[in-house]
Amino acid sequence: NPFILLDVGGATTDIHYSKDLVDDNIVTENEYDRLVFKKLGVYKSRQSLIFAAQNNEFVYELLTHLKVTENIFFEQTEKATKVLMQLAIFLVLCKISNYSKAYISLKLLAVNSIVLTGGITKVLTTEEIEDIIAFFYKKILASEHRPVTILDSNYDIWTIGAKEKQLCL
């Protein structure tokens, strides 16, 4: 703790976070909460994700960092899928940071670990994810802080959650 969990999928990108990252402006009794970004999926929400990316002032700098151009948005390649997943990570982090006032603002400098699960773990490497997170922290938060990146490629988190739910029934 504190942690955030990102589930980047085809239709949505979900973020689960520990409540110790939330400013006092949110009332919650749970130890954690979540947000679902319906328009930041990589397959079913592809066009919405691209639109959101094109409207972020830092995305073209990020694309340059990734050594691609905006033409990647129109490609149907494995490389394009990787870039879209990286953009989904970046855009969600922007939405939950002080950069964007549209959603809650999490204390991202206090995050010790970022766990990634979902389809993203089958497409991106740890290094590719860490590169995006480092870009976000440096560019948006002006910080050298680097949370530990953990890939849940076997969906262990969901298995544990399902088992605990059965015990409660």
Regions picked out by a protein language model, each given a short descriptive name:
Residues N1-L6, T13-L169:
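Helical "lid/coupling" subdomains associated with nucleotide-phosphate turnover
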